Amino acid sequence: MAEVTFPQLIQRACGIDVHLKVVVATIDGVGIHRETRSFKTFTSSLNELKEWLLSNGVTHVAMESTGVYWKPVYKVLEDSIPNVWIVNARHIKNVPGHKTDKMDSEWICKLLLAGLLKPSYIPPKEQRQLRDLTRYRNKLIQQIASEKNRMMRILEDCNIKLSSVVSDTSGATATSLIDMLCEGKVLTLDDIKSVYHGKLSASPEELLEACTGFVEEHHIYLLQMIRKDISQTQQLVSELSERIKILLSKYENVLELLKEIPGFSTKVVEDLVSEIGLDMSHFPSEKHLSSWAGLSPGNNESAGKKKCPNHSRKQTGKGGNYRSRMDCDPYKEYVFQ
């Protein structure tokens, strides 16, 4: 059976099948014979891969976005090879059958030579570093919220009904009362009045009744541990925020303009810039940006019926999950403008 061929649009290319311990690379093109080699994923082996590609005059490299395994390969090649593409694995699926690493790399190389692959948007190194910081900060903020919820469950176990009379258990009054309970103190009406805020809907007497329960030594120990964990995590968040501020200091004028958008706080602006950057030339139109950010419905039609759009991780990828979780209305309005 004759081999299926495609018109060749790229002179010399390489397709790489990336794994945890090994990468399989196939080169092909004008003036070179198709060749497949395997390299370990240690830095020295990846440098050998780079030298092999340079010696053969390869100008385009494509690989699947496999977990985080592609990142070291990309970092080694991005400064030496003119075009290093990360492509969506769903866009380069081969026909089912005899699947091997060599066949996968050959298939990627064949598609790349024919100009049938579309590169994913990989931000510049500076933006990738900023994104690592903002995503880690958001993860820590989620941990703080989780620990606060754990604290409230322990208080409920003690029959402390603070959440029933206070709308915001993270407010100044509620925090002060929880701190007293963590110290093992039996609250009195004078204690309540000493931290009472006039804007609270509940009266001091109602707060006292809600804070009367059966707090045991076991509960106090757990509450103290959780409070200590929250304090340490908040310190890490502050340090990350300072680091992010330093990295964005040279874009202060642009950040101030973005903060003029109603509802855009400093953190929202920092998260926005880390995810989509400041260079909009990467996106042909606002529709491309909305789609990439996971904020626009996709086309999912079968038998003439349009199915409900679903922005799952399968459609948007891990990065899309981060972007779609920035679900504040101002962010969405900004992207759609």
What function would you assign to each model-found segment?
Residues 1-337:
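A detector of single, family-specific signature residues
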